């Protein structure tokens, strides 16, 4: 499975303890998302299109309506980066 650079960046943030907060509109559809690092910074690269691709591939999951986190499949797909401390420049 090929993963784009943006998707890889989002998966790496989630692997380091980040989460994706979501809001729903009138119906069941998710209208806005915010990718937050474990330090509370917001990742600007994460938009609704990237979120939809990650969710469709089952790389992220939400449990009991909580924030989206990395699934076991997503954890296996994350490529290691030289930045192991989790310092992301936003």
From Swiss-Prot:
Domain of life: Bacteria
Signal peptide limits: none
InterPro entries for the chain: YjhX_toxin
Family: Belongs to the UPF0386 family.
NCBIfam families: PRK13687.1
UniProt-recorded name of the protein: UPF0386 protein Rru_A2144
Organism this protein belongs to: Rhodospirillum rubrum (strain ATCC 11170 / ATH 1.1.1 / DSM 467 / LMG 4362 / NCIMB 8255 / S1)
Lineage: Bacteria, Pseudomonadati, Pseudomonadota, Alphaproteobacteria, Rhodospirillales
């Amino acid at each position: 499975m090929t993963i784009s650079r943006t998707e890889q960046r989002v998966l790496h943030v989630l692997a380091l303890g980040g989460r994706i907060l979501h809001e729903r509109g009138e119906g069941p559809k998710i209208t806005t998302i915010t990718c937050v690092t474990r330090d509370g910074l917001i990742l600007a690269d994460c938009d609704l299109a990237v979120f939809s691709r990650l969710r469709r591939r089952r790389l992220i999951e939400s449990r009991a309506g909580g924030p989206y986190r990395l699934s076991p499949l997503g954890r296996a797909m994350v490529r290691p980066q030289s930045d192991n401390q989790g310092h992301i420049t936003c």
